Design a protein with these regions (language model features):
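NTP-binding/hydrolysis catalytic cores, primarily Walker-type P-loop NTPases
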Residues: 66-70, 363-414
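Residues at the beta-strand->loop junction immediately N-terminal to the Walker
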Residues: 221
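Switch/coupling sub-region of P-loop NTPases
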Residues: 216-218, 234-348, 356-357
Length: 414
């Protein structure tokens, strides 16, 4: 016996769909094709009825078991937009009986399609099943990295759907779903320079690639949805053939180079900092950290100081705030004093560049690139000594070169 989703909770029934003959159990691909055919022909279109009733009206019997749903890459009310390709980047359902909101080609729009609580919770379960965060035996058992029951989870399903789901009491008004659709093909540096309206200049792109080659750690800053992951992916692809790369993320998103491996923190139930330190035993040339937001900042700086540079993203409105945040995060667990952290960030052993991507001149692009200047006199609490390499000029509407590199890795050459 297994479990399936019906009437808002799990109930027991036979592993086999009731209307299928014993020798004709459909494959997951056949189930997916059947569901999408029903959806495309309008037989599956009312998401305000209970799940079992909706499926029965569509001629699908009582649906599938939880184990069968876990094998089918179908997302019910959201599936039409999941299939929309690069046009749709985000989908939101902000509570029971609320409408689906999508971001299509950069424009947010209300679809007018309402989703009842039962289908909303079904969609949450499907995302969590496909991401491997819950089991078919108990799909409503949400657990955090420490094994404790939680009411909010985020991750990636099918390597392309980055999601966040919440339920009461975390979300007191009811369940919510937010999904970001990752690109089927990650943009390259050439795409960002030439075909995306100039997200950054060729000169800036070449400098960042050369910096990675020469052991500089890059800190890529921006707000949510600003393009931090896109820029990181483009830089990774540019040096993929040259470096052994280890990527550490909450859940897998970034493209994996040929000589590389990925670590998923949520699945490992370890901390980011522990994963960073563990990767040092796996001989990386470059460590990529999906997002710095805590004590893993210290682990990244320590890794860079021992010859293991990295690329990491961070939420910040500009480059100097990003560097201050990195410094603050590195002291959070008390394992290093502010003075020690400042010493690492301004030492020749940890060449460091910060990049900010955000809205400049009315659209998304790189607007600031600065390097931290090597110095022995900088004190914690003082402004970090820095050298602006590129800055956006609002008068010319361009990213322009400011000063040459001062660090030993590029002085006199870049």
């Amino acid at each position: 016996m297994s479990e399936f989703f019906m009437n808002g909770h799990t109930e027991k029934r036979s592993e086999m769909r009731v209307h299928d003959p014993p020798d004709a159990a459909p494959t997951p691909d056949e189930r997916l094709a059947e569901l999408r055919f029903c959806q495309d022909t309008g037989r599956l279109s009312n998401w305000q009825r209970p799940v079992a009733e909706t499926l029965l009206r569509a001629g699908l019997g009582e649906g599938y078991t939880a184990a069968e749903w876990a094998e089918v890459a179908w997302y019910g009310p959201l599936d039409a937009w999941v299939r929309a390709g690069s046009r749709v980047s985000d989908m939101f359902i902000d509570g029971p009986d609320r409408t689906i909101v999508v971001v299509e080609e950069g424009n947010r729009s209300d679809t007018g399609i309402r989703v009842c609580d039962e289908w909303l919770r079904w969609t949450q379960r499907q995302l969590l099943l496909r991401a491997g965060f819950v089991t078919p035996d108990d799909p409503d058992d949400w657990r955090g990295a420490d094994g404790q029951i939680v009411h909010a989870l985020y991750g990636t399903a099918d390597r392309r759907l980055r999601f966040a789901v919440t339920r009461p009491p975390y979300a007191p008004d009811g369940a919510t779903v937010a999904v970001r659709v990752l690109p089927a093909r990650w943009r390259t540096i050439d795409d960002l320079v030439q075909h995306e309206g100039g997200v950054l200049s060729r000169e800036a792109a070449d400098l960042l690639i050369e910096a990675i080659r020469r052991g500089v750690t890059l800190l890529i800053a921006g707000s949510a949805g600003s393009g931090k992951t896109t820029l990181t992916a483009a830089l990774l692809q540019a040096i993929a053939a040259e470096k052994r790369v280890i990527i550490i993320e909450d859940a897998r998103e970034l493209p994996l180079p040929p000589d590389g491996m990925a670590v998923e923190v949520l699945r490992s139930r370890s901390s980011f900092a522990h994963c960073v330190r563990l990767t040092l035993r796996q001989r990386p040339d470059l460590i990529v950290l999906g997002e710095v937001r805590g004590p893993e900042a210290l682990a990244m700086l320590e890794a860079a100081a021992t010859g293991h540079p990295g690329i990491c993203t961070i939420h910040a409105p500009d480059t100097l705030t990003a560097l201050r945040n990195l410094e603050r995060f590195a002291t959070l667990n008390g394992l290093a004093s502010p003075g020690v952290v400042r010493g690492m960030m301004t030492s020749g052993a940890v060449p460091l560049i910060a990049v900010h991507i955000g809205i400049y001149g009315g659209r998304r692009r790189v607007g600031q690139i600065v390097e931290v200047i090597v110095t022995s006199g900088s004190q914690a609490g003082d402004s970090l000594p820095h050298n602006p390499l590129f800055a956006f000029n609002h008068a010319t509407n361009r990213l322009e070169r400011k000063y040459p590199v001062q660090g030993a890795w590029g002085k006199g050459r870049l």
